[in-house]
Amino acid sequence: MEGSSYRVVFEKGGVYLHTSARKHQDPDSLIAGVIRVVEKDSDVFLHWAPVEEAGDPTQILFKKDPSRGEPSTSEEEPTFDPGYEPDWAVISTVRPQPHLAEPRKGAEPSSSRSSWAFSVSLGELKSIRRSKPGLSWAYLVLVTQAGGSLPALHFHRGGTRALLRVLSRYLLLASSPQDSRLYLVFPQDPSALSDSFHHLQLFDQDSSNVVSRFLQDPYSTTFSSFSRVTNFFRGALQPHPEGASSPNLPPLPDDEPEPGFEVISCVELGQRPTVERAPPVTEEEWNRYVGPEGRLQNVPELKNRIFSGGLSPGLRREAWKFLLGYLSWESSAEEHKAHVRKKTDEYFRMKLQWKSVSAEQERRNSLLHGYRSLIERDVSRTDRTNKFYEGPENPGLSLLHDILLTYCMYHFDLGYVQGMSDLLSPILFVVQNEVDAFWCFCGFMELVHGNFEESQETMKRQLGQLLLLLRVLDQPLCDFLDSQDSGSLCFCFRWLLIWFKREFPFPDVLRLWEVLWTGLPGPNLHLLVACAILDMERDTLMLSGFGSNEILKHINELTMKLSVEDVLTRAEALYRQLTACPELPHNVQEILGLAQPEEPSSPSPPVSPMPLSPTRAPLPPPLPEEVIPQPDSSLEILPEDEDGA
C-alpha cells in the first residue's frame, strides 16, 4: 500500500477482541486494537490490528487465503466467544496514543496477539450483527460471503455508529426482517441489489420496482415496504429534501394506501384531566381489609388504594408478598403458613443443588460457572451505597448471591442475566428474609422475564408500544426526536429493562414498583411512566434545540432527579386523557388493556428499522464515541462528526 493508492478514511482505537469469556480476568484475553477502513486502488478494506504494549499497532494485514478458509469463531477457536458482553467496568480514560502507522502487507506477526489481525474487502461481507442494547460495551460481528465469522469487535470507547456510517458510504445495509440487530450487506449496484431483494422475498411487489424506489427515496420506501404504519405517522415518514435524489418522484395518493398498511385516522385528544395522589395505605387501614380467618376482603378496592397512594414503609414487608403473587389474596392465615412451609422446603432443595456441586464438577459445567462468575461481579456492585449492602462482608451481599444462584436452578433456561440483581435488591431490602425474597423475586420475574430473553423480542415490542403511545400523545415531540435520529427511543431501553430502577432514588423505586405491581389501571402503566417523563422534559428537549448527543446526555442526567409522585400523577393523567378519547385507535386500546388484540386478516411484514443509505442513513441506537461506560449508565454519547454530518 504505497503512494496515492492507499487512503485511510476511518480509524478508531479502543476496539478490543475478547478471546475467552471464561478467562475474563486474564489480561491476555482482551486484545486492544485499531479498526480502519482503507481505500486501496479500486477496493475498500476493513482492517483490524492489535496495539502492542509499546503503543504501536502490529503491522500485519489479514489476506484471504482460500486454502485456509475464512477466520472463524467456531471449531478453530474454541475459547472465543463473540457474544461475551463485559459488565459495567470503570476503567481509566488516560491511555497512551498509539502510533498509527500505515499497515504493511505481508509483515510477519511479532507476537501471539498479532495472529488475530485481519483484513477483509467490504465486498466479501455478507452481514453485520450488532449487539443488543444493554448494560455493556457494544460489539459488531462480521460474517463473510463464505459463511465464516470474523472475530467480534468490542468498542470499549464507542464508535459502532460512526463505523456503520462510514460503511454505508460503500454498502447498503438493510436490517433483516427476522432480526433487527442483523444488517444484511448489499453492494451499491442496483441490479445486484434487486437480485438480492428478490431472493430474500422481502417485498410483496415486484422487487425491481421497489429497488428503483429505494434508490430514489430510501427513507420512505423502507417504511412502506417493511412496516405497518398509519397516516397518523406520515409527518415522521417524509424524507428531508436533500434525502431524495429524484425530485420528480410522483407522490403517493393520500386516498390509496399501499398494501400492508393499516390506515388509522389521526385523533384529537381532549383536555388532560387533573389527578391527585392519595396518602399511602397505613397498617391500620390494611387491617380493616382483613376479615375472618385472616382472609383479605374487598381486594379490588385495596389494590386501587395501593395504586392511588402506595404503601407505608412498615406495611411493605407483608403487602409485597401479595402483590408479587407469593401469597394468595383469597387464602386464610393458616393456608398462608402452610404455603410458606412448602415453599421454604422447595427453596432449600433448589439451593442444595448448586451448593452440593464440587469445584471439580463446576469446572466441567461451564454454564453454571459462568452464571456464578457473573453473579459475583454484579452483586459486588449492586446498591453498595445502601446500608443494607455496604461493606465487603455484608450479609446482604451473600443473600443476593445465594438467591440469584438458586434462581438459576429454578429457571435454568433463562439463568442469570445482567440487571436481575437490580430487581432483587429492593425486594430483599424490604422483606429481609431469604426465602420470602426469592419467591417474591420469582413473582417479579414472571412479569419481566421477557426483558432478559436473548431474542429481545419483548423489549423491541415494548419500545414499539412506547413509540405508538407517544405519537398519539405528542406527535410534535416524536417529529422532533425523529429529526434528531432519536425516534427509536433507544434511550428509554434501560427504563423499561429494569423498571426505572436507576432513574429514581431508592425509596422512590419502592413506591413506583408497588404501584406498578397492582396492574392498575392497565397492563402497561410502566410505558405511561416513560411517556410522563418525556412529557415533563418536552420543552427542555425541544426548545433547547438538542441534537441526538445532547438528548442522550440530558436523559442520562435525569437520574436521581425525578420525583416519583410527580411522574405517577402525570402518568395517570395521560391514561385518563387517552381513555376519554372516543376514537382511540384499536392498537392503542390494546396497549392500555381496553381491547383484545384483533386477529390479523393476513400476514404482515414485521416492523424493521430502516436500511442505511448514502443519502439518508439513520443508524442503530447511538452509542458513545469517546466516553467510557460507567457503572450506572447503559447509554453512550456519540460526538458530532467532524464534517458536521
Curated annotation (Swiss-Prot):
What InterPro entries does its record include? Rab-GAP-TBC_dom, Rab-GAP_TBC_sf, SGSM1/2_RBD
Q: Residues bearing Phosphothreonine?
A: 615
PANTHER family linked: TBC1 DOMAIN FAMILY MEMBER 17, TBC1 DOMAIN FAMILY MEMBER GTPASE-ACTIVATING PROTEIN
Assembly: Interacts with OPTN; this interaction mediates TBC1D17 transient association with Rab8.
Q: Where is the composition biased (Pro residues)?
A: 600-624
A GO biological process of this protein is:
protein transport
Annotated Gene Ontology cellular components are: autophagosome; cytosol; recycling endosome
* Domain characteristics, as noted in the entry: The arginine and glutamine fingers are critical for the GTPase-activating mechanism, they pull out Rab's 'switch 2' glutamine and insert in Rab's active site.
The taxonomy runs: Eukaryota, Metazoa, Chordata, Craniata, Vertebrata
Q: Which residues form the Rab-GAP TBC domain?
A: 310-520
Record key words, sorted: Autophagy, Cytoplasm, Cytoplasmic vesicle, Endosome, GTPase activation, Phosphoprotein, Protein transport, Transport
Q: Region (Disordered) spans which residues?
A: 57-85, 596-645
The name on file for this protein is: TBC1 domain family member 17
UniProt site (Arginine finger)? 377
Protein task: Probable GTPase-activating protein that inhibits RAB8A/B function. Reduces Rab8 recruitment to tubules emanating from the endocytic recycling compartment (ERC) and inhibits Rab8-mediated endocytic trafficking, such as that of transferrin receptor (TfR). Involved in regulation of autophagy.
Query: According to the UniProt entry, which residues carry Phosphoserine?
Result: 602, 604, 608
Task: List the residue ranges of the region (Required for interaction with OPTN).
Answer: 217-309
Site label Glutamine finger, positions: 418
- Keyword Protein biosynthesis on this protein? no
